[in-house]
Regions:
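Juxtamembrane membrane-water interface segments that cap and precede transmembrane helices
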Residues: 22, 195-198, 232-242, 395-400, ...
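Non-globular, low-confidence helical/coil segments that flank catalytic cores
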Residues: 95, 120-122, 137-155, 166-168, ...
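N-terminal leader/targeting segments
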Residues: 1-87, 299, 469, 488
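Membrane-helix interface and helix-disruption motif detector
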Residues: 28-39, 341, 399-404, 461-467
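Membrane-interface helix/helix-cap signal primarily in integral membrane proteins
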Residues: 2-8, 67-246, 553-560
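Hydrophobic alpha-helical segments
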Residues: 1-30, 306, 310, 422-452
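Alpha-helical transmembrane segments of multi-pass integral membrane proteins
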Residues: 353-459
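Hydrophobic alpha-helical transmembrane segments in multi-pass membrane proteins
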Residues: 59-64, 233-402, 467-514
Length: 706
């Protein structure tokens, strides 16, 4: 008598469920910090999952997964609280060792990273955990180097790891917990020897840029260590728009190449198989250490070791279980890495490969050459499909030709990367071998040329506002069904995939409907990083934006969240100097005009003096001269007067006293649109102009007759 067995709807993998519950626990805890009402859906998820396990009588598994779920909450709380410890010390002495030096783009300004930081207040010393971000102003030479011990008087504050409902992932990634600023003339520098790894990186950087040039040398350095500070904006944009920016970051692709080479040679040696495994473990751990335990490198290393270990134990390797184990290990130690784009892309690419390649493997190709070609093309397609939602949601674009260019570029890169690693080792031993760098130079030049050509093609990339959460979930569900991890057969499976993808496309379409400004009045908004005006013609102007690197990144994120692709102008009133390259790149990306006074501190870097309109980095720049702009300076603030679409505007910068208000009435004797974006602004006449307090004002008339 045959036993009646019922096929499971989903191919059950405990590690996958555990990884998913850990992820949900971390995400819910982060959301709860921003909105306490998120406790409700977090509880609903726990109850629904518990009921499911009770029905299936999986009591032990329920206990394990609920423990992991709550563990996700716990480790997230500990992480956030570690960064939330209040620290604001006036006039303290900070002493720290420089671990990183980056030129900010402002003249004489550098961003440093301090480690082993000690602060001293009234002879009481306190050691700080983590690292500290330090901005140094007025640097007159390049005397600051990695390894130096720097001390100086400052005010130090802690970094909020969750800010504006989002995770400051860049700070978290580098374990930066505090920030401060120092004046170069008030610091003392004690030269110190850098570590072996720091010497290795510095020497490699110098060798590559010297023998391969700034462009190729910078790319090669990024490929080796994941540090993209030497790559200029144009190169970065070209690689991004062509769809090969992933090769610039040390990732699983790089680990895979090195692992394959080492594994091949170890198999040729007459060594015990466990000694070979130990050699692989030591090599991969060392590589992770050099790459500062980048999540993508750690993920790839864990999966490589799992693959070898299962073979040693005579077991069958399961890709989904392997990637889930890697996810669990990384998130247990660094839970907020879930919000790191590199982490997401690394797992997305592998997930795509696992799910899509299962479909390709069903075709039994007899011709070995054809099979290898199909395999290579399939991997490129699968990885691009796997990371498609992540790229759309994180970067706001889709590279149209990414699959095709990766088919061409990856084989070239597969030759370039191992050669670069090997030749770089020889050059580190002796510069006599530097001539060998001509080979990787030629290969990378070829990749750059291909990237430039593809990015210049029509419709090379499509700007989007992202796919959104619902469409992303539906997209990956369709991938799981296609990969055979959901047991549906024949037409039902096909219809399920089509229906799921159609729903995903529908939500993507809804998510990408641009924002329309339909007010007949003016919208004035004040934000930590900018103030803005929407005119009655639906023009959008941003005023005195935060020009720091963090400010620009945050502003891009805010505009993306508001579904704004184009703005009409950046208006600068305050005379603060800023990085001309950062602002120019921003203006180019958002197709906007820059307005600033002729005597603005940054005007010489942006403009050709004497012309009203000039070209700079493909971005149109305008500046006001004194014929079209007047400024009125008062005790505490300044007012700038200018025209937008033949309408006269006054924009204030500063908080005015009552005495100032009386002077403003005497100076301005005609109807204007008055915009103030400072807190506690005063009334002009008998009307309250604007009290920002970080609120959004819709349809608020700003016409004030004075």
């Amino acid at each position: 008598m045959m036993e009646n067995t019922k096929e499971r709807f989903i191919n059950f993998r405990p590690l996958v469920i555990i990884a998913l519950m850990l992820c949900i626990g971390v995400v819910f805890m982060v959301e709860i910090y921003s909105n306490i009402l998120m406790v409700i859906p977090a509880g609903v998820v726990a109850v629904v999952f518990a009921l499911f396990c009770f029905i299936k009588k999986k009591y032990i598994f329920l206990a394990i997964t609920m423990f992991i779920y709550l563990l996700g909450f716990g480790i997230t709380v500990l992480t956030i609280e570690t960064y939330s410890k209040s620290l604001s010390k006036e006039d303290c002495l900070i002493i720290g060792r420089v671990s990183d030096v980056v030129y900010s783009g402002y003249e004489g300004q550098y961003y440093l990273t301090f480690e082993n930081v000690v602060i001293e207040v009234e002879d009481a010393k306190t050691s700080l955990s983590g690292k500290t971000s330090v901005t140094v102003y007025g640097v007159v030479n390049d005397d600051i180097t990695v390894g130096d011990i720097i001390s100086g008087k400052t005010k130090i504050s802690n970094i909020n790891i969750i800010e504006d409902n989002s995770v400051n992932i860049n700070y978290y990634h580098d374990d930066i917990r505090y920030y401060c600023s120092l004046s170069f003339k008030n610091i003392s520098i004690e030269n110190n020897n850098p570590s072996v790894i720091e010497k290795l990186k510095t020497t490699t950087k110098d060798n590559l840029t010297k023998h391969m040039g700034e462009e190729v040398g910078g790319i090669s350095y990024a490929v080796l260590f994941g540090d993209k500070s030497l790559i200029d904006y144009q190169t970065s944009t070209t690689f991004r728009e062509s769809g090969i920016s992933h090769i610039l970051a040390v990732s699983g692709l790089h680990v895979g190449f090195l692992f394959a080479i080492l594994y091949f040679f170890l198999n040729k040696l007459p060594l015990n198989r466990w000694l070979k495994f130990l050699a692989l473990f030591i090599f991969l751990f060392g590589f992770c250490f050099v790459c500062e335990f980048s999540p993508s490198v750690v993920r790839a290393s864990i999966m490589c070791l799992c693959l070898v270990l299962t073979r040693l134990l005579g077991k069958q390797y399961d890709g989904l279980s392997g990637i889930s184990l890697a996810f669990i290990i990384i998130v247990l130690f660094r839970p907020l890495f879930i919000y790191d784009v590199g982490f997401q892309m690394s797992f997305g690419a592998v997930l795509g490969s696992i799910l899509i390649l299962k479909v390709i493997d069903r075709f039994d190709l007899k011709n070995k050459t054809l099979k290898n070609i199909v395999s290579g093309v399939s991997i490129s397609i699968a990885t691009q499909i796997g990371i498609l939602p992540i790229i759309a949601n994180s970067f706001g674009y889709l590279a149209t030709y990414s699959v095709l260019i990766n088919i061409v570029v990856i084989p070239i890169f597969a030759i370039f990367y191992p050669l670069l690693c090997i030749i770089n080792l020889f050059v580190l031993i002796s510069n006599v071998f530097s001539f060998l760098l001509v080979v990787p130079f030629a290969l990378m030049k070829t990749i750059v040329a291909i990237s430039s050509f593809v990015s210049s093609l029509p419709y090379a990339y499509i700007e989007v506002f992202g796919m959104g959460l619902i469409s992303t979930i539906l997209f990956y569900i369709a991938m799981f069904v296609l990969g055979g991890f959901v047991n549906l057969k024949g037409d039902i499976k096909t219809l399920s995939i089509i229906a799921t993808l159609c729903l995903s496309v529908m939500f993507v379409t809804i998510n990408n409907i641009p924002k329309k400004f339909t007010t007949n009045n003016f919208i004035v908004e004040n934000n930590t990083y900018y103030a803005s005006i929407n005119t009655e013609n639906n023009d959008l102007y941003l005023i005195d934006i935060d020009t720091s690197k963090k400010g620009i990144e945050k502003l891009r994120s805010i505009l993306k969240g508001k579904k704004i692709k184009q703005i009409d102008g950046l208006i600068f009133i305050s005379n603060t100097n800023f990085s001309s390259s950062e602002i120019s790149n921003f203006a180019k990306d958002f197709d906007c005009v820059i307005y600033l006074p002729q005597n603005h501190a940054s005007a010489p870097n942006l403009l050709l003096m004497g012309n009203d309109v000039v070209e700079y980095d493909d971005s149109k720049m305008l500046y006001f001269n004194f014929g079209t702009m007047q400024t009125f300076t008062y005790q505490k603030g300044l007012i700038a007067e200018f025209n937008i679409n033949n309408k006269k505007f006054l924009i204030s910068s500063g908080v005015f006293s009552e005495e100032d208000v009386l002077k403003i009435k005497n100076d301005i004797l005609y109807p204007v649109h008055f915009v103030s974006y400072d807190e506690n602004s005063y009334s002009l006449g008998d009307k309250q102009i604007f009290n920002s307090n970080y609120h959004l004002y819709y349809g608020e008339k700003c016409d004030i007759v004075i």
